[in-house]
A protein has these predicted regions:
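Short Pro-Gly-centered flexible turn/kink motifs
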Residues: 581-603
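Helix-loop junctions that connect tandem helical modules in alpha-solenoid scaffolds
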Residues: 52-55, 94-101, 146-154
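An alpha-helical repeat/solenoid feature that recognizes helix-turn-helix modules
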Residues: 55-76, 101-121, 157-174, 213-217, ...
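Low-complexity, Ser/Thr/Pro/Gly-enriched N-terminal "stalk/linker" regions
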Residues: 16-88
Length: 603
């Protein structure tokens, strides 16, 4: 385990004197971005960061992120600052340099946002030459990914309606089109949100399959920010969604600055998702005074955590890819400059919002940890009910925030462990980005070669409490047949399951029932963990080091414990797992109900 990860896992509540959000952003994050952009200005297309060529052609958003990053730095200095003309000249040169490069969807939004910022301060004409601006007016258009006949998205998930809407609104402000397109896109965006969120207020990333993740909670805040950015008030309906998203994120506030815990694109984006939602909620005035204080204290800790953990002093870059860390292939290291710029922008614009609210230079609340102790210990967030239930249980246990999502990863994500129906908690329990190993769920390999797993189809979810213990029960009338891009329901096995969560311990008990005798090649389950130095006795493993103290599996033929030695297949967003417990059942015919389970205790 790396020294950096050891320090992260063993750190208790933050002891350093609280520093204002503005101070961290302006003294730690903005100088880091300015240094990267200085390297870009010096090296141009030859620019390399930590051995990675910036202009590889693989980042479809890079020109827009460069434009927004330059605008963020340019506008952070006063108009009479001697650096301002140099920054404007650099923007002009790099705009001309990258104008013909691929720049899609989010990149278009970032670029038009940068241009509107420059227009508002009267710097657009100086920062972009006329020929380049003429090209940009044609290319920075939402119509490149929206069918103008019926306003459906072209090969993009439904959250891209928000991107298209933002581009259209900004084009109106730039004087490039009238408001008709943005109004139609707003209607489509809100229709989708209503259709697939129902009464609960969270966006399904799919057309009703049930993928509710970080982005499902973040999207309401992004929509609100598009209105704020373009100078108007979000509709009341959007404000209601923001409030619901804020509830989810308030339940996740912690003293470390850790972020959202499950699904794709977490790591630093899990942290900034919480920052963006809480900031939007503050900006549209849906938080009370105590919630404002908690939110501000959290965003300050989040910025500190980002600067201390995610920024690499040796390379001068954000690091999501090395030191045993792993992120989605979508955010590979080929996007190194763009990822630096987009994460930093999320801190820049949210810091500006808090400054406008009167928090510039204000230290966070001094009794933050005590205030966290007073937060509710349990919250149940329903995403959908119907043929299948989709829900998120959140528990607070000491410094841990534990999330148990019962959702469906849907097409492209159902087979990846960050979407499994298992507990997640920063620094304690994690999935593996794009990872397919059977983390805390059994995979049934049948005689015909099919692999079945209990991942997607939840019914009759019930959540009850008994003192400090929370009990979750559900059934699955069918399980997920793996191997395809989308989940496939398979009724050859049914499941009834019970989770029991109490302070310091989580237990799962499953009963799998075959509809008819099944030829099994085997059953496999794993538990990969940050804990180290495991000693095994029968099916119980006790760990000498790390957050998990004990793991016990039941119902399996055998379990084996091994050290992982920074195995690339077992890396998580914050660093590598240290150990793995592998449990198996050998080939047999399954005729009767089979009881399997596990229990883990944590420090």
């Amino acid at each position: 385990m790396s020294i950096v990860l050891v320090a992260l896992l063993t750190t208790g509540a933050v002891d350093a004197a609280p520093v204002s959000y503005n101070e961290i952003v302006e003294t730690r994050i903005r100088p880091q971005v300015a240094q990267l952009l200085e390297g870009l200005a010096t090296q141009g297309r030859r620019y390399v960061i930590d051995g990675t060529a910036v202009f590889s052609g693989d980042d479809p958003f890079l020109p827009g992120k460069i434009a927004l990053g330059l605008a963020d730095i340019l506008l952070s200095v006063p108009a009479d600052d001697p650096r301002r003309p140099a920054y404007i000249a650099e923007f002009r040169r790099l705009a001309a340099l990258t104008v013909d490069d691929p720049n899609d969807t989010w990149g278009i939004y970032y670029y038009v946002s940068a241009l509107e910022k420059l227009r508002k301060v009267g710097a657009l004409g100086a920062a972009v030459d006329r020929a380049t601006l003429a090209k940009l007016r044609v290319r920075l258009d939402w119509r490149t990914f929206v069918d103008v006949d019926d306003f459906t998205l072209i090969d993009h998930p439904n959250n891209y309606y928000g991107v298209a809407f933002a581009i259209a609104r900004l084009r109106v402000l730039l004087g490039w089109e009238d408001a008709a397109g943005s109004e139609r896109l707003l209607t489509k965006m809100l229709e989708h949100y209503r259709q697939f969120s129902g009464t609960y207020g969270f966006a399904d990333e799919t057309d009703g399959e049930g993928r509710f993740d970080r982005y499902s909670v973040l999207l309401a805040a992004e929509i609100a920010q598009r209105f704020i950015e373009t100078g108007s008030r979000p509709p009341d309906e959007v404000l209601g969604w923001v409030r619901k998203s804020a509830d989810v994120m308030l339940a996740r506030i912690n003293p470390h600055g850790d972020g959202f815990e499950y699904g794709r694109s977490i790591g630093p984006y899990g942290t900034t998702a919480m920052v963006e939602v809480l900031t939007a909620a503050a900006a549209v005035h849906v938080l009370n005074e105590q919630e404002m204080a908690l939110a501000y204290a959290y965003v300050s800790r989040a910025a500190q955590y980002y600067a201390d953990f995610w920024l690499n002093a040796r390379t001068g870059s954000l690091d999501m890819w090395d030191q045993g860390r792993r992120t989605d292939a979508y955010r590979g290291k080929f996007r190194i400059l763009g990822e630096n710029l987009s994460v930093a922008h999320q801190f820049f614009y949210t810091n500006a919002a808090w400054n406008e609210l009167g928090y510039r230079g204000k230290p966070p609340m001094p009794d933050f940890e005590r205030a966290l102790d007073r937060l509710p210990k349990r919250m149940v967030t329903w995403f959908a009910r119907g043929e299948y239930d989709r829900v998120l249980l959140t528990l607070r246990d000491r410094d841990y925030v534990i999330g148990l999502p019962l959702i469906n990863g849907g097409e492209s994500q159902h087979m990846h462990s960050p979407y499994f129906p298992i507990p997640f908690a920063p620094r304690l329990l994690a999935g593996i980005a794009d990872g397919n190993s059977p983390q805390l769920v059994p995979y049934f390999t049948l005689g015909d070669g099919s692999v079945l797993a209990p991942l997607a189809y939840f019914q009759d979810v019930k959540i009850t409490t008994r003192g400090t213990t929370t009990i979750v029960t559900f059934r699955q009338p069918r399980v997920d047949k793996l191997g395809g891009r989308a989940p496939v329901p398979d009724g050859r096995i049914t499941l009834t399951s019970t989770y029991t969560l109490s302070p310091g311990r989580i237990t799962r008990a499953d009963v799998y029932t075959p509809r008819e005798p099944l030829d099994l090649k085997g059953i496999a389950m794993e538990f990969a963990t940050y804990a180290e130095d495991g000693t095994q006795k029968a099916s119980t493993v006790r760990f000498a080091k790390g957050p998990v103290q004990e793991f016990k599996a039941t119902g399996f033929d055998q379990c084996l414990t091994e050290a992982l030695h920074d195995n690339p297949d077992y890396r998580t967003p914050i660093g590598p797992f240290s150990s793995k417990v592998s449990c198996r059942i050998e080939s047999r015919t399954l005729r009767e109900p089979l009881t399997l389970g596990w229990s883990l205790a944590y420090r």
